[in-house]
């Protein structure tokens, strides 16, 4: 199985616990974080939106500060600004990667994570259900 996935750093940290039978080729955050402006859509922020108020304001202020640091880094190339960006970056920042895994790993992930409290796992498991030969993953019809 090979697929492109865009998800937040929290989800990727959990995905990376599956090391055997997987490969991940990511777009490097370290080399590209300063290229484009920070926008709310670069982040998973559904929970922040649901809570609203000061939480939403804090998120938007963080984006403003990240953008200020990005501009300073691009202007000066001083790595202290780049380092501050990496340290301040919320874990909701979305990263894109191509993953390759076998059906055995997908089956393990599916059964361990299909009812997970992170919505991203539920979405991922739904994508696995749509794959050819998904019954090898879901084990539906097997006794």
How would you name each of these model-derived features?
Residues 1-143:
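Family-specific signature for flavin-dependent thymidylate synthase
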